[in-house]
Amino acid sequence: VIRNLLAATAVLMIATAAQAQEPARGGPATDVPLLPGAQLAADCGNLLSLSGSAFCVTAPLGEIGTLADAYIADLETRQWLAAGGDDNRVVFVKRRDGGGCDGLQMQAFYDTSKADVTATDPGYLAFATIPGDICAAQPASPAAPPAAAGTVPQ
């Protein structure tokens, strides 16, 4: 049990560091179910250029937080660990059987171009994979060039 906790902690620390920047978007997450209260939004509301690159669902904006919590709980039952993110995005990691980690991100959004947004306006959740092994070691910073022969290091 302690070994699993240590491994999970290490995964979270590595993934958080790896995801400090906006992660690259892979393709739509294909294993995310349509939970109660969500409706499929194949075009992702034609917002954020997500159509075709993410699996999107919609619900009234006033309910999107509760729906996001339900998706987080559902993903946790399938071994996805919340590892980072920001105000409107959660990054998840999942250990691969052969080593390394898969990444998934959930982003909440709505149409910010509207002047008067209400709780009944559509809110969206987009799910997309993060390409590559997100637990892979980050490249080390380049070493300082060696001092030229005959010079005194400073």
Feature roles, as predicted:
Residues 1-9:
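Bacterial N-terminal signal peptides that target proteins for export
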Residues 4, 20-154:
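An acidic-aromatic pocket/loop used at catalytic or ligand-binding sites
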